[in-house]
């Protein structure tokens, strides 16, 4: 794929902005509402967004895959693929919204809190709003308009601050939920206009009259989308089922609020690597369709390399500075979430490897492998949570998720080696562990009170790479994305 490095830097930058905005939202909402109402808010929003992420992304992702395969070879098919995916997605989302609205009393009953019913009903409107914005996100992924994607993602982050925090301040929990409806609607409107401005410019073949648009098989989209949708369903449940089991088993809004804070901040490494999956699926779809096995292996190897180099310091520093990060985002009232968050953050590292490599397999059309692995992981996670939460509380929930994530990481690494003929470098892992251990030890020697931990963390993050460079692990090729961005060479749409 051309300009892989520059596109990755753009998308990573947008993910950083988006997630920083997200943590501003979480911090502000948590402080405004307090632990109990923040726990209720977390339950409502997490469940609703989980549904749209897992059910609503299968068809758009399939659209993205097929757009990527034909965008250079036969761009006249772009409108047909888009129209068929839009039709299927609209039918699905309207149905899911109706079912969720009608099921709200049952969901609240299962959570032993009937007062959640009106909030769940209101949150059902998040589903079509979120789906509308996400549809264009995957549309632009398939067309490799990565720079436009990055701009829209940043806009969405800022819109979340404006709407969610503003509405929470004036209207409480209902306002927070309403903000989740308004923010993606704004982004959808911008993306809709951008489609008219940019798509015809880069792909003149898409100017065909409506009657001339080539038909595209809905069956082909659905055959790819259903196992992918199940994968997203099982994966999202693995990352969130512990929160619902904490609520159901412990029946404490306060404990739920603490755990929601722990897992929200603990997911930072995963969110930053999400940009890699955005590029990886369409890139591997394209190289697989072209039967370019050498380029496919190169992309997977490069992704593994990025995971090794970047994931170790992120997870290590987040664990080292957990108390300070929690205090920064939520204040002293959430200090009791420190130990669960440290354990959960380690699990997020394992789960990030699983998620990124799953999209490499999905891009190659091997969608049933991640689907099956995630199903096994979900069953194991539920069983461990039910066993651990009554005995160990929040620590048990975090430990259960981490153990399940470790098993999933091992499984996906085996599948990746088998199907792409690539594997993790044992020497690179060993050197990264050495560097991570060094910065973890130094973290407790450098200033960490108040906001000094941010400066200390930056120094240690740079020091990690300096150490790898010193021992010969970090090469010039590893630094090429940053060099290309600074030099301005290459372009990404």
What are these regions (language model features)?
Residues 27, 57-73, 141-142, 203-204, ...:
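Helix-loop junctions and terminal segments of transmembrane helices
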Residues 444-493:
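Membrane-proximal transmembrane or re-entrant/amphipathic helices at the cytosolic face
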Residues 104-123, 253, 301, 318-349:
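Interfacial segments at transmembrane-helix termini and the short loops linking adjacent helices
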Residues 121, 151-200, 375-381, 394-415, ...:
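Hydrophobic alpha-helical transmembrane segments
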Residues 129-155, 345-376:
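Membrane-interface junctions at transmembrane-helix termini in multi-pass inner-membrane proteins
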Residues 25-27, 39-56, 87, 227, ...:
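Alpha-helical transmembrane segments of polytopic membrane transporters and translocases
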Residues 3-61, 97-101, 126, 161, ...:
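Signature of the first transmembrane helix
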Residues 6-22, 156, 180-187, 191, ...:
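Transmembrane helical elements of multi-pass membrane transporters/channels
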